[in-house]
Regions:
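Glycine-rich phosphate/pyrophosphate-binding loop and the adjoining helix
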Residues: 153-230
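Short, glycine-/small-residue-rich phosphate/pyrophosphate-handling segment
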Residues: 113-153
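A short acidic, often aromatic-flanked loop/helix-cap motif at beta-alpha or helix-coil junctions
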Residues: 39-43, 150-155
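N-terminal beta1-alpha1-beta2 submodule of the flavodoxin-like/Rossmannoid cofactor-binding fold
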Residues: 1-85, 90-95, 101, 109-110, ...
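A polyampholytic, Gly/Pro-enriched intrinsically disordered region
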Residues: 55-58, 133-141, 161-174
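A short secondary-structure junction signal
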Residues: 94-95, 126-129, 157
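Short, surface-exposed basic-aromatic patches at helix termini and helix-loop junctions that form
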Residues: 22, 97-111, 129-140
């Protein structure tokens, strides 16, 4: 049995999970689905202000509410748990954070083998690190990490994701491609399910992550991840700056949230292109191979 806990707004994360699990279901493995439903509702498409107002709590790991009760009956002896979600503001989404902080979830995941699947734009590193820390704290055993990401250039994907998040327009239009993970990439995600199926059959999860990586489970883009690491640090300062004016949905912090929005526009469309150019000019100095091993592989003692 494999249990899939998932959070999705647009349906993309669920599409990814279904495709990964298809080979398992076809082989006779029981796949049990459990949606993660936050007590605090998050709209989709988003209102612009509400989306950016959720930033400080997302970055600081302070979800404003918990999740609806989950049904754990009949899944106690699952051979594998898959957790599927997405990144918000270079961190796990607030519903994912609420999920990991739930006491029943902690008790259930203790000792379980876990694969984390992230369907995101193109910055997944800090989310992966946060999830890894959550799982380590509750004594779960992370055996896999899969990232399906938007393959469009960074600035293009920023435009398409805003169009999708705020206006609900996923389809290609004018000169912009469709937003999100490409349909072909979602369809091809079944190859990860084939690898997971063999691991379950052999009860051998020690080599699962290297096998997933060999199949393309993570497309490692060092210049983007350098931007992410820098952005994550700066986001921490901004999150504290905004929260000094109030907590989640406090109208007193509206001005600071709006300032952050314009700061983000400048970073995305002015600063980041030059930062990427600088990275490529200094590429030999960045020890990319070492960082890739640290960022993509999972220690066997997790």
């Amino acid at each position: 049995m494999i249990v899939v806990f998932y959070y999705t707004q647009s349906g993309q994360a669920l599409d990814v999970a279904k495709r990964i699990c298809q080979p398992l279901a076809e082989a006779g493995t029981e796949v049990v689905w459990r949606p993660i439903i936050p007590q605090q509702t998050y709209p989709f498409p988003w209102n612009k202000y509400e989306f950016f107002d959720s930033f400080p709590e997302t970055r600081l790991g302070m979800p404003p509410s918990g999740i609806q009760p989950l049904d754990f009956s009949g899944i106690e002896k699952a051979e594998l748990v898959m957790i599927v979600g997405q990144s918000w503001f270079l961190s796990p989404s607030l519903p994912l954070q609420s999920f990991f902080e739930n006491e029943q979830v902690k008790a259930y995941l203790e000792g379980k083998k876990v694969v984390f699947v992230n369907a995101c734009r193109n910055m997944w590193l800090m989310t992966g690190r946060a999830v890894k820390a959550y799982l380590h704290e509750i004594k779960a055993c992370q055996v896999g990490h899969i990232v399906l990401q938007d393959t469009a250039p960074n600035l293009i994907s920023a435009l398409t994701i805003v169009r999708w998040l705020l206006y609900g327009k996923k389809q290609s239009s004018w000169l912009l491609p469709a937003a999100g993970v490409r349909k072909a990439d979602i369809e091809d995600a079944s190859r990860f399910g084939d690898i997971i199926k063999i691991a379950i059959e052999k009860n051998d999860f020690q080599h699962l992550q290297p096998q997933l990586l060999a199949a393309g489970a993570i497309d490692y883009k060092p210049s983007i991840l350098l931007l992410e690491k820098t952005g994550h640090r700066m986001f921490g300062h901004w999150a504290h700056f905004i929260r000094k004016r109030g907590g989640f949905r406090d109208p007193r912090r509206r001005t600071r949230v709006n300032i952050f929005f314009y700061y983000l526009l400048v970073v995305l469309f002015v600063v980041s292109p030059f930062a990427q150019l600088f990275f490529y000019l200094t590429y030999p100095l960045h020890c990319v191979g070492k960082h890739k091993r640290e960022d993509c592989y999972i220690e066997s003692n997790n």
